Regions:
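Bacterial N-terminal signal peptides
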Residues: 8-20
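A short, structured surface patch at a secondary-structure boundary
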Residues: 51-54, 58-115, 120, 125, ...
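Structural recognition of the beta-strand scaffold that forms the well-ordered cores
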Residues: 51-53, 72-75, 120-124, 139-142, ...
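Short helices/loops that flank or line small-molecule/ion binding pockets
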Residues: 107-117, 135, 247-257
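Alpha-helical, coiled-coil/dimerization segments enriched in small aliphatic residues
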Residues: 217-244
């Protein structure tokens, strides 16, 4: 018989407050532990049929084969921002996982959801809840609360532990190890970049209609700090979670005139070669110096919070200062990462595809 307990959000918000994300030369804070109300409630018997309404946590469960094989549904964003060639090569059965229970308006279609016969549903935060208790099965909020909204290591370790605890699986520490390895490896280079006061723009969207940047208290802001860079948008006022990703004008970007630009959902090539009408990117220092880079896309876009994002600070330093971290080092570290994290020997052609400029 399926567990029918709804895990209330207040239990998840009772986690201790984590300190502010440090500069690149400091370690990350310890991850929050799943509260007892989560850890104590595991599904009895065999592993369940798992549904995940969001995208970022799916990458974490991909690293746990015992859990992954029971996923039957995931939000469409998990596939929209992925390199399907990589996903299908790594997980040949990925096609069995459906996103059809999410409507075009991104609301849950309860009839389609129930057709999946889920035993447990994971969601992230109030915006993804969508009255999931109607399904009559165990639901788990993966929002650790507090400042973890811009602490990627703490967030992913929390997800990894919560998946293991609620599914009755042994805990692993893959993501903690991965983040600690990267932060240790980049420490001297990030410190040198920090001393140079390198000014960076983390460009979330640049589709010709709007420019959206990562302001303070965002993952993007944290990634830049890890790499030793100053976020040019770090002092902008924000309001609420959605406000952390800020619409700005081309005039504002020109006034910032960053040294380097990282493009997440958009094309670095278009920025470099004048492919976006009405935007004067060619006047910027970063464009003139060829310091505009798209974040890699593999299992998901590394620039969000993907299963590969612990490699992102390494990538950022490689692109800005290849004399510190060479292309060969990045390539080898990425190959090793896929093997360690997913037991996946990524082919050379796909590894090149992941790291290619878009």
């Amino acid at each position: 018989m399926c567990v029918t307990v709804k895990l209330i959000a207040t239990a998840l918000l009772a986690i201790f407050a984590l300190p502010t994300a440090p500069c690149a030369t400091a370690g990350q804070p310890a991850a929050a532990e799943p509260p007892q109300s989560v850890a104590a409630q595991t599904l009895p018997g065999s592993y369940p049929r798992i549904v995940i309404t969001g995208n970022c946590p799916f990458g974490v469960i991909l690293a746990n084969e015992a859990a992954y094989r029971h996923v039957v549904g995931v939000g469409p964003w998990a596939f929209m921002h992925a390199d399907r060639h990589v996903l299908e090569d790594m997980k040949p059965d990925i096609g069995r996982i459906t996103s059809a229970f999410i409507n075009k308006d991104y609301r849950v279609n309860m009839e389609s959801l129930m057709n999946l016969r889920p035993d447990i549903i994971y969601y992230y935060g109030k915006s993804q809840d969508d009255r999931l208790e109607r399904a009559g099965v165990m639901t788990v909020d993966l929002d650790a609360g507090g400042k973890t909204k811009y602490q990627p290591m703490a967030t992913q370790v929390y997800w990894e532990n919560t998946f293991a605890d609620t599914l009755g699986l042994p805990r692993t520490h893959k993501f903690k190890d991965a983040w600690e390895k990267t932060l240790k490896q980049i420490r001297p280079y990030a410190a040198a970049i920090h001393a140079q006061h390198v000014r960076a723009l983390y460009l979330e969207e640049s589709d010709g209609r709007q420019l959206k940047v990562s302001g303070p208290h965002t993952y993007g802001d944290t990634y830049l700090k890890m790499a030793g860079m100053d976020n040019v948008a770090g002092d902008l006022p924000v309001k609420g979670d959605a406000g952390r990703y800020i619409n700005v004008s081309m005039e504002q970007v020109m006034a910032w005139d960053p040294d380097v630009i990282f493009v997440v959902f958009g094309s670095a090539k278009a920025l470099l070669h004048g492919g976006i009408p009405g935007q004067a990117w060619e006047t910027l220092r970063a464009v003139k110096n060829g310091k505009v880079f798209s974040t890699p896309v593999g299992i998901h876009n590394w620039g969000g919070l993907s299963a590969e994002t612990s490699l992102l600070p390494l990538f950022m330093i490689n692109r800005y200062a290849p004399e510190d971290i060479s292309d060969k080092t990045l390539w080898e570290e990425t190959r090793r990462y896929y093997q360690t994290m997913f037991s996946y020997a990524i082919p050379d052609r796909l590894l090149d595809e992941v790291l290619a400029q878009r």
